[in-house]
UniProtKB/Swiss-Prot annotation:
This is 8-amino-7-oxononanoate synthase. It catalyses: 6-carboxyhexanoyl-[ACP] + L-alanine + H(+) = (8S)-8-amino-7-oxononanoate + holo-[ACP] + CO2. It is an enzyme of class 2 (transferase). One of its GO terms (molecular function) is 8-amino-7-oxononanoate synthase activity. Belongs to the class-II pyridoxal-phosphate-dependent aminotransferase family. BioF subfamily. GO terms for biological process: biotin biosynthetic process. Pathway: Cofactor biosynthesis; biotin biosynthesis. The modification N6-(pyridoxal phosphate)lysine is found at K235. It comes from Methylorubrum extorquens (strain PA1) (Methylobacterium extorquens). Its EC number is 2.3.1.47.
Amino acid sequence: MSPNPSNSLDAFAGEKLAGLEASALRRRLAVTARGPEAAAERGGRSLVSFSCNDYLGLAHDPRVIAAATEALARYGAGAGASRLVTGNSPPLAALEERLARHKGKEAALVFGSGYLANLGIAPALVGAGDLILIDELGHSCLFAGAAMSRAQTVRFAHNDVAQLRTLLAEHRGTARRALILTERVFSMDGDRAPLPEILALAGEYDAWTLVDDAHGLGVVEPGQRAPLEMGTLSKTLGSYGGYLCASQPVIDLLTSRARSLVYTTGLPPASAAAALTALDIVETEPERAARPLALARRFTARLGLPEAMSPIVPVLIGAAEAALALSTALEARGFLVVAIRPPTVAPGTARLRVAFSAAHDEGQVDALAEALIELAPESVRAG
């Protein structure tokens, strides 16, 4: 068969890119130099960033940097092998012990990222003949892990406990095992799952529950713990990596069966050491941990929005083009607030996702609120 130029790889990519461009959905990487105190530089412009998940500003904390530097000098830049070979460094083992204690669990397992953790957990626990029930607004990696498991996967309406009960009643009887997937804090809406009700249903229907705590660790009251508590090291802890906290038998099983752990290089020792020191700070400086939520609530009160439930506040715009235009207008005023568009959020719900940090001050929060009142009065109302 002779080559068809119109069917080339580049032609395919160009056609798809043109479609994304036409619908204002093309993504581009923008070089951003983050600094301390919520500072960022992009395109030669100094900005105040409200688009970072470093909720406590610990990525630039001198104590965290010192811990990483010491581990870097002692253990080298990388782990050098998978954890089951020689990549299980002393900082990793120490971090797992501390994470388990923080979560009130017997053991913990650190992965290369939160995404990798969720790719590995569900397939290690359930498979064909089993059932997964997942909140429709769960993170992409929860859905990816569910798909890889080959279990029957059913979405339930966001935070809808009544529908979850209906689906459990309908499907649980024919499934060997059932796993419920949700988030403590939802990453694009900033709201929280009704965990007491979900955990009660899980008990009633003999189901297991995994809670993704990527955006909640250290910055919201955890409330009731789930049997499976996963999260990241890259947000509140200012480092990089993911983890699962659970019982010792569950962690032992995943050590053998989670493919995203077994077949990848271990986390760099410096990342583990940084996260370990950051966790110490979270536990010993509660006033710092409380600040992001307090600032988020100051912001929502100023704009007359529903009271923030977490450090994440969505400002709903609607059309992707309008969200991009508002983001650009804010950048011209010195604020970095990135537009979130489909498929990350549903069509027609493009937004600015405003993330608050202990590194922000009240003046910066108030200035952003005033800019939004002026630029997008239809999306906010002054309180």
